[in-house]
UniProtKB/Swiss-Prot annotation:
One of its GO terms (cellular component) is mitochondrial large ribosomal subunit. It holds the Pfam family Ribosomal_L34. The gene is MRPL34. Belongs to the bacterial ribosomal protein bL34 family. This is Large ribosomal subunit protein bL34m. The keyword Repressor does not apply. Residues 1-46 form a transit peptide. It comes from Homo sapiens. It comes from the Eukaryota.
Amino acid sequence: MAVLAGSLLGPTSRSAALLGGRWLQPRAWLGFPDAWGLPTPQQARGKARGNEYQPSNIKRKNKHGWVRRLSTPAGVQVILRRMLKGRKSLSH
């Protein structure tokens, strides 16, 4: 009878009883220590990722342009290799 009386007075489900009636906002979601006393890791939000490439036409032409390619022997080899392969665009 004690089990029946306890179930009538307390929470109706076992999971709600384990959470102590705080089923709306568990402590783990709020960043408070969990059942073992360890703080839960927070997700790092607001950290910008994937924005490493910021295109600049000036830098692109200076590094890979026609004048820069022909100014060095290795650049001439690049142009000749692309001509041999049949590339439509030889440089930027």
